[in-house]
Structures are given as C-alpha cells and as structure tokens.
Amino acid sequence: MGRRPQLRLVKALLLLGLNPVSTSLQDQRCENLSLTSNVSGLQCNASVDLIGTCWPRSPAGQLVVRPCPAFFYGVRYNTTNNGYRECLANGSWAARVNYSECQEILNEEKKSKVHYHVAVIINYLGHCISLVALLVAFVLFLRLRSIRCLRNIIHWNLISAFILRNATWFVVQLTVSPEVHQSNVAWCRLVTAAYNYFHVTNFFWMFGEGCYLHTAIVLTYSTDRLRKWMFVCIGWGVPFPIIVAWAIGKLHYDNEKCWFGKRPGVYTDYIYQGPMILVLLINFIFLFNIVRILMTKLRASTTSETIQYRKAVKATLVLLPLLGITYMLFFVNPGEDEVSRVVFIYFNSFLESFQGFFVSVFYCFLNSEVRSAIRKRWRRWQDKHSIRARVARAMSIPTSPTRVSFHSIKQSTAV
C-alpha cells in the first residue's frame, strides 16, 4: 500500500515530462519564497518540480523537506507528510524527488475506519463491564439495609443513574440503524431524549454528592437536617425540564437524524450541555473548599464519621475529573495529526465507556461500610450453616452405642 502513491506520482511525472507543470509564474513565486532565506556559498537555486512543488534556494549538501502536494491528478494527499529532495554538493538539485511518504487521503480514511471499529469494540467492552459492575453494586446497596444512610443512598442513586445511562446506550447502539437515523422516526427521538436525560442525571447526582459533602464538612451543618427528597429533586427532577426544553428546541430548530448531532449555527444542544458544565464547575469549587477544610481543620479528627467523609472525598476527587475530562474532550479539537486523532479516539472511548465501572468501584466495592457489612453477612451465613450442619449431623446418626445396647436389652427382656 505504501508504494501505491509513489507509483502514481512517478507515472504522473512521466506524463508531465511531455507537458511540464512548471510555468514562469510558479517559478517567480518560488523565487519570491526564496528571498526570505539567507543562504551563502554554493547553493541550489529555487526550482519548481514537475509535480508543482517549490524547492527554495538551499545550501549545497542539504536534504530539503517540503510538504506533500494537497491535490494532484484528481487525488487528495495528506499535506502533514513530506517530500524530500537533495541539494547536491555541486549546487544542483537531485533528479529524483522522494515522495514515498505522500499518502492518499483514501488510504488514511481506510485507516480511520480501522481505528473507528477498534474504538467501537472498546466502547462495547467498556459498557458491558461497567453495566455488570454497576448491577452488582446496585444489588449490594439493595440487600445491605444496615448501611442505608443518606450518604449511601446518594451513592445508590448515582449508580442507578449510570445503570440507566448504560442501558439506554445499548438501546441506541442496537436499534438506531443508519436507515432509522435518516428517517428520524418518533421512537428514535424518544430514545435519544432518554439517553440525554440519564446523561444529565449522572452529572446532577455527582452534584448531589458534592452538595452533601460540602454541607457536612464546609458548612458544618448536621446531615440529619438533610432530607432524601431534596437530593431526589436535584438528581432526578431538575434534569427533566432541561431535557423537555432541549426536546422542544430540537423539534422546532433541528428536527432531523434522531436528534443526534447538530446543524451548523444551531445551538439547541447547549440547553442541556450548559447546565452539565455549570454543575461540573460548581462541584470543582465544592471540592476545593472541602479539601481545604480537610487539610486544615479536620486533619487531627479521627472520628468514624470524619474518616468516612475523607474516603468519600477521595472517591469524588477521582471520579469528578473522570466525568469532567470525558465531557470536556468533546470540546477539544484533536488537530490534523494522525497520531493525535488516534490517541483522542481511544482515550475518549475508554474513559466514556468505563465511567460506570469506576463509579461502582470507588463508591461501592472500595466503600469500607459495604465491605464491613458483607463480611458480617458472610460470618452470619457461616455461623448459621455451621450450626445447621452440627444439628443435622447429630440428628442423622441412625444408631449410637447406647441406643444399640438398650435395644438389645429390650429384646432379651421380651424373650
């Protein structure tokens, strides 16, 4: 594949030998480009080759580098790669120009498709692992009633929001085909709205985590005064009118392609993206204040409640940047460089798909209260079954030596 562009250019050079591309106008432009160079001694004069590439005035014995042509004989080339030509020691240009690195955009599109398919596999794998981990965490919070305080209820709801988001992601991937995407049927728009709603709830439940910690640590209010319904309204309630407003905007201004993507000049997606960015920034402010208090006032405190707060803060410190980084990446332009684009695609796919896994690990599997409750349950189960086993063994002995001798005595007496 690497030789194909070079062969195409060589064939073109043979054809162009009969009808040179180089003109006096091109030569003049190339000469003007060389005026800025400060070259002394033996040198190669400015020259335009048969492809149309300008080789500026250069010192003898130097390998000169120029970008590949952008468009040649109906084929687009990647201008981030280079062609090479040697200025010989005698001050003349080498007859051969090395265009071996100049690749057709078509080949790069094929490479992009390969990277896209790998990214899709990473996405499916990550969402599967995340969904399994989230479901396990959900069941643990459901079964372990002994740890059901407000702090863990907030964790539980955050995990539920991620489960629903992961589930709707699979619905989108498995049902919205290119044909459905173009037809813009009502049900696919509802699926998109549901996915975006659960996406927003993730951020608002993370905001609930920040509110709880900020209230308990920075404002030093008793958490007994906080109520579950307040956080339910924040996490599940507030995103609903936001998505309704977004859906109305899409319906009137961008009603196409199942409401995925956006048309140039239409900014309806900012109706829900704006609040997400806002709560993300507020959470960063909360975390700054929380860490400041923990580093100064609560460092010496060793109460169990303070220890739990510290662990919750550590989890939030890890998870909030994860959520923030993945979302802010959508606003980053990876540039034209192929390596940058590939790194961007893989990095974004990994973080986006494994978010749920990280949430379940930090808020459930590494939660000391959850682990302690599981150990207690396990010990109770072992004790219960060991007692049953002892009783069962005692009851399952058919005859003991005492019972045998008594039975024998009874028989002999009867005789």
From Swiss-Prot:
The gene is Crhr1. Residues 24-111, 175-189, 254-269, 332-338 are extracellular. Its main location: membrane. Residues 143-149, 219-225, 296-306, 369-415 are cytoplasmic. The chain crosses the membrane at residues 112-142, 150-174, 190-218, 226-253, 270-295, 307-331, 339-368. This is Corticotropin-releasing factor receptor 1. It is a multi-pass membrane protein. The modification Phosphoserine is found at S301. Glycans are attached at N38, N45, N78, N90, N98. It holds the Pfam family 7tm_2. It comes from the Eukaryota. Disulfide bonds join C30-C54, C44-C87, C68-C102, C188-C258. It comes from Rattus norvegicus (Rat). G-protein coupled receptor for CRH (corticotropin-releasing factor) and UCN (urocortin). Has high affinity for CRH and UCN. Ligand binding causes a conformation change that triggers signaling via guanine nucleotide-binding proteins (G proteins) and down-stream effectors, such as adenylate cyclase. Promotes the activation of adenylate cyclase, leading to increased intracellular cAMP levels. Inhibits the activity of the calcium channel CACNA1H. Required for normal embryonic development of the adrenal gland and for normal hormonal responses to stress.
